[in-house]
């Protein structure tokens, strides 16, 4: 059985993050090993949420797994609670990613033109380091703009989105997938780019 490590928060309410990743990955007959980055009372769109940062647990977990010769077919990252966690995740990659381990990065930090509550304007710069290590990076449009220094706007045409994807690819990932792309009224899809082949793929 293949094994995937999912590094992201546990939101006690809100249908997201590890509470979604664990059952979905498990339903695909893949073992999902979880690495909680924080425990939140709700996801960050609820006002007044409370959070317990688990930064000090990430590397001890990684070191213990390594001592047990744990192998991972993939490592997926989602919500990282602080700049420190972006550094810890990169060290997690160094400890546990083998030559065939897929690194899948969702730079979950923003939506609707704004950073999530609790993140300062410098946070995208830290997240770039994680994205640079990815084999596959899957930001939404807001996150892609923040990562590439592109001014956010409400409407985008295909040439502009492709330009953003090219800028994302320059950060280092082998494949970039833009999520939440508006293809029409009430219709969202994805736009992907593989820089090695200079090839785009649309679904929506």
What is each model feature region?
Residues 1-105, 109-117:
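Conserved N-terminal subdomain of the carbohydrate kinase-like
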């Amino acid at each position: 059985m293949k094994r995937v490590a999912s590094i992201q928060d546990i939101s006690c309410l809100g249908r997201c993050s590890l509470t979604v990743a664990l059952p979905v990955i498990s339903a695909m007959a893949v073992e999902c090993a979880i690495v909680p980055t924080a425990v939140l009372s709700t996801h960050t769109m609820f006002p007044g949420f409370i959070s317990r940062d688990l930064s000090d647990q990430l590397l001890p977990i990684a070191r213990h797994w390594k001592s047990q010769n744990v192998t991972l077919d993939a490592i997926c990252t989602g919500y990282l609670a602080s700049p420190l966690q972006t550094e810890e995740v990169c060290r997690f990659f160094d400890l546990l990613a083998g030559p065939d381990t897929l690194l899948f990065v969702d730079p979950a930090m923003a939506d609707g033109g704004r950073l999530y509550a609790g993140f300062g304007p410098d946070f995208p710069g830290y997240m770039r380091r994680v994205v640079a290590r990815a084999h596959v990076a899957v930001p939404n449009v807001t996150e892609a703009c923040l990562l590439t220094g592109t001014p956010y706007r409400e409407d985008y045409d295909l040439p502009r989105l492709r330009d953003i994807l090219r800028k994302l690819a320059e950060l280092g990932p082998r494949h970039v997938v833009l999520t939440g792309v508006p293809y029409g009224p009430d219709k969202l899809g994805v736009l992907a780019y593989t820089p090695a082949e200079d090839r785009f793929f649309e679904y929506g």
